[in-house]
Regions:
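NAD(P)-dinucleotide binding in Rossmann-like oxidoreductases
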Residues: 206-208, 220-285
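A contiguous active-site-proximal alpha/beta segment in oxidoreductase catalytic domains
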Residues: 101-161
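Hydrophobic residues in well-ordered beta-strands that form the structural core
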Residues: 72, 95, 120-122, 250
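Short, Asp-centered acidic motifs that coordinate Mg2+ and/or phosphate
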Residues: 35, 69, 146
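N-terminal Rossmann-like dinucleotide-binding module
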Residues: 1-51
Length: 319
């Protein structure tokens, strides 16, 4: 039996805690968390509340030295320096999106990582989603003709993200296009092919706030794509649909559905709400992290795919 790979974590905020808990509770056969670093005062308290959590080390370098794979959930400006330090030390890296705050830096990093044959991937969980696997099976029986993506929020940031509102609510690094639409662009790239932005419109509030609405037309592998996003247009905390040919769709992250003969949407038999699906998805992601770290084939988002998504996101926001 293959031994679990050791995992170091930089950043123990919302995403870091979520992945750490998944590693401890659902993926012990794949990874063993061994070290954490986060300079925030609240991080030690957060870590102390997690049963079986590894110790907090004094520096990022100490975490890199202790692990086989470094998971990076720090603020985006730190992603590339941390990733390059880990790669230089012979570690694999698993990075939260986006790759960087600067597209120029992201492009240069991807070029260096590819040239070096680095073991590096980005955390787009749809790579391991059972609902997406169901969509893929249904899509195999279709000829893709059109895709419609819609996302909507009652407020931005979402309720559970308010602790990070200081930057998520701002135009410079935040907004729902970077945080949420990026996942559906990754899904589109995987399902249909290379992305091309044709036109986009963005609505910004006065001041430095993040976008309140977007519309865009794209193509994906030659298939026409429409994209809409808005704040204040739903009562759900988070509502989204990814609909292919008006016939199959992913709804609210985790419900694979297809159109019935009577015109109603029917869920896949094993459909689950996102909060119940998430542990399964993260377990799958961590199994893929272990495979990547061992140098095996994996399904994780490559740094090239993540860069392609970031290019489209930033082009939309600059429209």
């Amino acid at each position: 039996m293959t031994s679990p790979v050791t995992l170091g974590l930089i950043g123990i905020g919302i995403m870091g805690e979520r992945l750490l808990r998944a590693a401890l509770e659902h993926a012990s056969e794949s990874v063993t968390p061994v070290a954490v670093w986060d300079p925030a005062p609240a991080a030690a308290t957060r870590l102390a509340g997690i049963t079986g959590a590894p110790r907090m080390l004094a520096t990022p370098d100490a975490v890199i030295a202790a692990c086989d794979c470094l998971y990076i959930a720090a603020p985006p400006a730190a992603h590339i320096p941390l990733a390059e330090a880990a790669i230089a030390a012979g570690r694999s890296v698993f990075i939260e999106k986006p790759l960087a705050t600067s597209l120029t830096e992201a492009r240069a990093f991807v070029a260096r990582a590819e040239a070096a044959g680095a073991r590096a991937a980005v955390n787009f969980p749809m790579a391991s989603s059972p609902a997406v696997a169901q969509l893929s099976a249904w899509r195999a029986a279709l000829t893709p003709e059109s895709l419609a993506i819609e996302v909507a929020f009652p407020t931005w940031p979402r309720g559970w993200q308010q602790a990070a509102a200081s930057w998520l609510a701002k135009r410079a690094e935040g907004g729902f296009t970077r945080e949420v639409v990026s996942h559906f662009l990754f899904l589109t790239r995987r399902q249909l092919g290379p992305l091309k932005l044709l036109e986009a419109q963005v609505t910004y509030p006065p001041g430095d706030g993040a976008e309140s609405a977007i519309t865009a037309r794209l193509s994906a592998g030659g298939v026409p794509v429409t994209l809409k996003g808005s704040v204040g247009t739903t009562t759900k905390d988070d509502h989204n649909t990814w609909t292919l040919n008006g016939a199959i769709r992913l709804r609210d992250w985790s419900f694979a559905e297809r159109l019935s003969a009577d015109g109603t949407w029917a869920q896949a038999p094993d459909a689950l709400p996102n909060e119940k699906m998430r542990p399964m998805v993260l377990r799958g992601q961590l199994a893929e992290v272990a495979a990547m770290t061992r140098g095996e084939a994996h399904r994780l988002a490559t740094v090239r795919e993540a860069l392609e998504v970031q290019e489209i996101v930033e082009a939309i926001l600059a429209s």
